[in-house]
């Protein structure tokens, strides 16, 4: 089954507000315990639909830590896809996290938040990513990326 997902960056919030009115929530899992590889750091904000493990591994590396929640989020690319937003390197304390994923027909809306703090003495490459079940149909989907 081949699924075509078309990425669309929303220039106007009114489009997403309109789509969100009749949208249904989609279950998602936040991607944890990964990092952006040094050779994959974008020069500008990257919004990407990731369909395969090789695409994912080209951008992200595992960052397991000790403890009960220390393992990287498992992803089964036969059944799931990843929506990722990756920022360029910054020395500003930046946290990115998902708020919701909604669906209205063939439109999928990924709402995420970016919190910025103060200048730091080191650089980071902030990102947020979610794992979704792969859509059941062969329809094309338009992805709307919405920073709140």
Q: Model-predicted segments: where are they?
A:
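Sec-dependent bacterial lipoprotein signal peptides
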Residues: 1-11
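Exposed, flexible binding/inhibitory loops of compact, secreted disulfide-stabilized domains
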Residues: 13-148
